[in-house]
Swiss-Prot record:
Keyword Membrane listed: no
Organism: Arabidopsis thaliana
Name by which UniProt lists this protein: 1-aminocyclopropane-1-carboxylate oxidase homolog 12
UniProtKB keywords: Iron, Metal-binding, Oxidoreductase
Record family assignment: Belongs to the iron/ascorbate-dependent oxidoreductase family.
SUPFAM superfamilies: Clavaminate synthase-like
Cofactor note: Binds 1 Fe(2+) ion per subunit.
Amino acid sequence: MMTKNSIEFDPYIERKAFDETKQGVKGLVDAKITEVPRIFHHRQDILTNKKPSASVSDLEIPIIDFASVHADTASREAIVEKVKYAVENWGFFQVINHSIPLNVLEEIKDGVRRFHEEDPEVKKSFFSRDAGNKKFVYNSNFDLYSSSPSVNWRDSFSCYIAPDPPAPEEIPETCRDAMFEYSKHVLSFGGLLFELLSEALGLKSQTLESMDCVKTLLMICHYYPPCPQPDLTLGITKHSDNSFLTLLLQDNIGGLQILHQDSWVDVSPIHGALVVNIGDFLQLITNDKFVSVEHRVLANRQGPRISVASFFSSSMRPNSRVYGPMKELVSEENPPKYRDITIKEYSKIFFEKGLDGTSHLSNIRI
């Protein structure tokens, strides 16, 4: 039987009304709401398994110390083996002693917070859903109008840093210097990571870089306001990344979980560490040797939670480069598991479906 509430609830109309405020989730919190609006409600079967099961509650993703990566050949090879184990079995690992200065990490987190807590009228000047033509875009839920069943409890801004960096005036003053400085270090560290990943595949160090895996850097900076009813919603629903590789800087609030052996495992924050995870395109070109693992972020009464995700994603701009399983990694015994596809085509699938809780790789699996 249709109830009065179910008749009155129109998800599209409510999403549009929320979007037109241009104030995001923070605007709701600033209005001192005590109940989470219906568009943010997730299905109960998704929300009932938030805590890791007893069998995995003591598990943690691999933590790899990079202090000796440049010391000598033996030290580098030992780190490559640890990276190989992590990306083949977990798809995630945390890096300590990665050489990015702590003050640079703290300043980018502070810059992200400053922007999101800026005067609403200033933020509105950067609000857009035209990510294709603007270097810097602020909004809430990039997939708000996709087929995703629920809206997530977060606001974000995104910025394409490479290969064509934005002009300084395109970046808000509150986070401008921090973004340029942090991204400079991320690009350098990303280059090292792709060298180690190439070596973990038994290939030459520059193999992945030669495939343009390091060419494009997209930064997405999330702000998760405190939630009055965290048991009804999620910060980000289950998904995998449509990138080659993602570097994540998170604050001390926590909430990130990865799906490991059909159970959710907490990724506990480590001060000064970076979280690294394999994206869909690296799983594709390695023919499932490296795994792109689904993950999510819980909503929390504490907050705001700040995170900075840096995606090495080739170019989402129109280009003709085709990606498929690498010839060096396929054989009669291990045939290609995916069809060839362009970044543009895969991104179209990703943005049309949004974060709907299913793997986008399934659309191109042979």
